[in-house]
Regions:
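Catalytic cores of carbohydrate-active enzymes
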Residues: 676-677, 795-910
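Aromatic-lined, polymer-binding surfaces characteristic
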Residues: 199, 229-232, 589-614, 618-627, ...
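Secondary-structure capping and boundary motifs in well-ordered enzyme cores
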Residues: 226-230, 244-247, 471, 635-642, ...
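Long, charged, mostly alpha-helical binding arms that flank functional sites
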Residues: 26, 150, 202, 539-542, ...
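Aromatic-rich carbohydrate-recognition surfaces in CAZymes
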Residues: 255, 647-658, 662-765, 790-797, ...
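Carbohydrate-binding/catalytic loop surfaces
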Residues: 632-636, 676-695, 723-742, 768-787, ...
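Anionic coordination/interaction segments
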Residues: 1-641, 656, 661-664, 706-711, ...
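Inter-helical turn/loop segments and adjacent helix faces that build the functional surface
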Residues: 171-172, 710-719, 738-739, 802-819
Length: 912
């Protein structure tokens, strides 16, 4: 039935009320100042019996740090349930962060709760009960990984419960504050009195704003009054001392306290010019609570009407959203409308008879998502060309990037796998309803560098095809309907720190914040369309000047859209002019085919065949090498080790790509033999970090040896490349834009320098670990310069063995003898100092303590030490024992996953 919602607040209290015959209810909130606790009281009217769910996501970190990578930040949240006091606690590992705790005021209530949102995915939640757990949890939860505080009460007549939330410096402090809060009585405070003037002003602001723009000439009349001209302006002409002035001031203050930006200008018509009684009257009205807002941007100004020219007064009348006179202000008696965005139809669950655990099917060329089945997590798909790409899921259009998926996101990004994120939407309007065509799709196919969403609305089928252009920095979207021409819309979110304008039917936009790589984004539509930047105007036809979206809207049965980026405005317009010229998805298919090896695995296991024949090569080429991004993390940079690892796969399908990348990596090596751990292209030059990592540089000689073995192209060894130049870092790493050397050396010498740089060993004769090895998360184990890595030691021996044929090819017998001896010494040290009963250990830290041994309380077994021992030595008694130990300890049969190591680090600070 019809439901209306109201919200009131005053000081430290608020109230939300639902007025519905079906379910009238309210939530009242307050702060218990004596114990620094938030209290939320719920109740439903009448004799209804109900349960109440209360949930939030604990962050416990500074917003900017959390926002930089929410999923990574969430890994460090832990939960603990005190069953005696019935309090749920949250903390962030590492110290220096606040604690958080939640409880019910009534200790007789035994609630259900969860501290983790692993079971929640936006497109699988059909009702609120899906958010809450099925049983009461016991204490001792530990790491949450994906934290969520969700509490569900038992049924109670009247639905009256009080939830208490507090923060403190320790678990003990939180407990004490909640215990004090439980002794308090919840009393609803009086909320602020109604303010119909503020309601009227808000309604005019949302619905009555004119289209008058603000030029520099126009704005000068506001700037001289210290008004900004960038927020909505209300103007009142004052002819006499009247209560209308105080009502206007009260409306202004109410909007300010509700965080609604506005400016207020009083134009005074003085009859007595010398004494100015009207100005004095207004100043007297504003001496107290309004004083902080006087004559400043976003505030209140008083000016003589005679000081404005006739043209300026005419401009103010056109520009102001509310222009009134002090003797003619009206107070409406009827309720005023507020803009409520229409519901955009998305996921609608279907009922199936058979039990289904997975909603995806696979074959040798792609993935099919069938919406008749359940999905417990999003399935993501990366599409990329040489200059741009996109990450989508089976229910959303994700985000678009230009060149660098981290630094140059054309549309907004959210890596939260549990949310329904819509940075871009393609929406169809049919019979007054709006449908998100990705979220509403009944079938999604990821195949050959394309995503195809299909379904039907009101009996009319549709198909939405998405792909990245191979050479153009753009992503295209082709939409086709059968037998109907709906309103088709491409909608992009627009934040407050973005600027945008329309140039010949093309949206151009850029980020006003400082960016390491500045760029201009663009959006284009193939058809004649309306360009809109206001969601209220797009959906309701009312220009509220919200400036919250960029959108195209057209009525057609077939349309193409494009989104992309370029270094500047003119370049963006040139690229846009080349987009939306027909179906060019064939070039995306050809690009993918070029980078997928022609071999096919035939093992008798269809899933395994699909993995090795298509999925792994596709992920390697498109997601890792060209896109350098995924759903969870958008790196955007070249990783020295990362993309060289990918070359071991790419060499089978695109050896020329591998050749170019080997030369690129040589150009990012220092003369000392170490390398830039990662870097990205910036206007001032390639920028990244120089580290003391122990293994990344070893992938250069390994990849070169593999490339020559697979292609026979030994000429690459004679190509001369320069080095990066800077002082070696004193500590673990340094972020820099280094210079380039004038001198050059052959690729072969680059490889020799890499091997020579890896010769350094510690007290046990093993390779020094430095600031990390393959596992970047172990960055503190050897940061003091004494820790040793068993993994890097095995890797060094393996690389020397693989590079030996290249040294023979170059007839470099001195290097052959030297590195053979170094390798033999490492193997001897490994067998003497790195085998612990039934496993190879992982490392020695700076203090000489064993990591990955039988007696290690954390990380007692690590897969890398066993795997690389077997890869290097083959089948020996010790390698078989190590692999068996790792299999028993690390393989999770239920999840069918291998842990990297176990138990996880909890007390020992391994780094990262």
């Amino acid at each position: 039935g019809n439901t209306s919602f109201s919200y009131e607040h005053s000081g430290s209290h608020f109230a939300c009320t639902s007025s519905s015959a079906a379910f009238p209810a309210s939530v009242v909130g307050t702060i218990y100042r004596g114990c620094r606790t938030f209290a939320f009281k719920t109740r439903c009217s009448g004799d209804r019996t109900c349960r109440v769910g209360f949930s939030f996501v604990p962050i416990l970190a500074r917003q900017e740090e959390y926002s930089a990578h929410p999923s990574f930040s969430s890994l460090f949240i832990e939960a603990d349930y005190d069953s005696t006091e019935r309090i749920l606690h949250f903390k962030r590992r590492g110290g220096g962060f606040p604690y958080c705790a939640i409880a019910l005021s009534d200790t007789d209530i035994l609630p259900q709760f969860t501290a983790c949102k692993d079971h929640i995915y936006a497109h699988s939640v059909k009702e609120m009960s899906d958010v809450f757990p099925l049983k009461i949890r016991s204490e001792g939860i530990g790491a949450t990984i994906n934290p969520l505080c969700a509490i569900l009460t038992p049924e109670r007549k009247g639905g009256e419960f009080v939830f208490l939330v507090t923060c403190g410096g320790s678990k003990k402090e939180c407990t004490e504050q909640l215990l004090r809060a439980r002794r308090k009585r919840f009393t609803r405070q009086h909320t602020a009195p109604p303010c119909p003037e503020a309601d009227e002003m808000l309604a005019k602001m949302l619905f009555s704003r004119p289209s008058e723009g603000l030029s520099d000439v126009d704005s000068s009349c506001l700037w001289r009054l210290s008004l900004s001209g960038t927020v909505p302006l209300a103007v009142m002409e004052v002819y006499e001392e009247t209560s209308a002035i105080s009502r206007a001031l009260r409306a202004f203050l109410r909007l300010k306290t509700a965080f609604v930006k506005t400016e207020l200008l009083f134009l005074v018509h003085e009859k007595e010019k010398y004494s100015s009684p009207l100005r004095a009257f207004i100043v007297e009205q504003t001496e107290s609570e309004y004083a902080p807002f006087m004559h400043r941007a976003g505030g209140i100004a008083v000016a003589d009407a005679d000081s404005f020219s006739a043209e300026e007064l005419a401009f103010l009348k056109r520009y102001a959203f509310d222009y009134s006179e002090s003797d003619s202000i009206e107070i409406p008696g009827a309720a005023l409308p507020l803009y409520v965005p229409p519901k955009i139809m998305g996921y609608e669950p279907k009922t199936v008879a058979a039990e289904v655990k997975n909603g995806f099917s696979y074959d040798a060329s792609g993935v099919v998502s069938d919406e008749i089945k359940e999905h417990y997590m999003p399935y993501s798909y990366v599409m990329a060309g040489y200059a741009a790409g996109t990450v989508v899921t089976h229910k959303t259009l994700g985000f678009v990037f230009w060149r660098n998926a981290r630094e140059c996101r054309v549309t907004s990004f959210d890596g939260n796998p549990y949310a329904a994120y819509y940075g871009i939407r393609i929406v169809a309007g049919i019979a007054g309803r709006f449908f998100d065509l990705a979220a509403f799709s009944e079938k999604t196919v990821f195949e050959g560098g394309k995503s195809v969403y299909s379904g039907s609305i009101a009996g009319h089928g549709y198909e939405l095809k998405v792909y990245a252009r191979t050479k153009l920095p753009a992503v295209e979207y082709r939409l086709k309907f059968d037998g109907i021409s709906p309103t088709c819309m491409l909608i992009k979110e627009q934040s407050a720190d973005m600027t945008a304008d329309n140039k010949g039917g093309v949206w151009l936009f850029s980020d006003m914040r400082h960016r390491a790589v500045p760029f201009v984004g663009f959006m284009k539509c193939s058809e004649k369309c309306e360009t809109v930047n206001d969601s209220a105007l797009l959906f309701c036809g009312v220009d509220a000047q919200r400036r919250d979206i960029l959108a195209f809207s057209c009525t057609t049965d077939e349309v193409s859209f494009a989104i992309g980026g370029a270094p500047g405005r003119e370049a963006a317009l040139r690229v846009a002019s080349l987009c939306c010229r027909g179906d060019t998805s064939g070039e995306a298919e050809a690009f993918v085919k070029k980078h997928i090896p022609g071999y096919r695995l035939q093992s008798g296991n269809a899933g395994l065949d699909a993995l090795f024949s298509h999925f792994a090569p596709y992920q390697t080429a498109i997601s890792r090498f060209f896109g350098k991004t995924g759903f969870y993390q958008t790196g955007g940079a070249f990783g020295f080790r990362d993309q060289l690892q990918d070359c071991f796969c790419l060499v089978y399908s695109s050896p020329e790509t591998v050749r170019v990348h080997i030369l690129r990596c040589c150009a990012h090596q220092y003369r000392e033999g170490d390398v830039m751990h990662w870097w990205f292209r910036a206007p001032q030059g390639d920028t990244g970090i120089r580290t003391k990592c122990s293994d990344d540089f070893l992938y250069l000689p390994w990849a070169v040896a593999d490339y020559i073995e697979k292609t026979g192209d030994a000429d690459i060894l004679n190509v001369r490349i320069g080095y990066m130049e800077s002082l070696p870092p004193e500590s673990g790493e340094r972020y820099e834009t280094p210079a380039r050397s004038e001198s050059r050396e052959s690729v072969y010498m680059h490889c020799i320098r890499a091997l020579a740089n890896g010769e350094k060993t510690g007290s046990h004769g093993l390779s020094l670990m430095g600031s990390c090895d393959w596992n970047d998360g172990m960055s503190r184990i050897g940061s003091g310069g004494r820790g040793e890595s068993v993994f890097t030691s095995w890797l060094y021996v393996l690389v020397c063995r693989e590079f030996l044929p290249v040294m023979k090819l170059m007839e470099d017998y001195r290097s052959i003898a030297h590195f053979t001896a170094v390798s033999a010494g490492l193997v001897l040290a490994l067998e003497r100092n790195a085998f612990d009963g039934d496993r190879y250990i992982r490392a020695y830290d700076d203090a000489g303590r064993v990591i990955g041994g039988r007696n290690s309380p954390e990380c007692s077994v690590d897969i890398l030490g066993q795997a690389f021992a077997a890869m290097t030595l083959g089948r020996t008694e010790r390698t078989v024992s190590g692999l068996d130990t790792a299999y028993r300890a690390l393989f999770d049969r239920k999840a069918k996953l291998f842990r990297l190591f176990d138990p996880p680090f909890d007390r020992y600070d391994a780094g990262y």
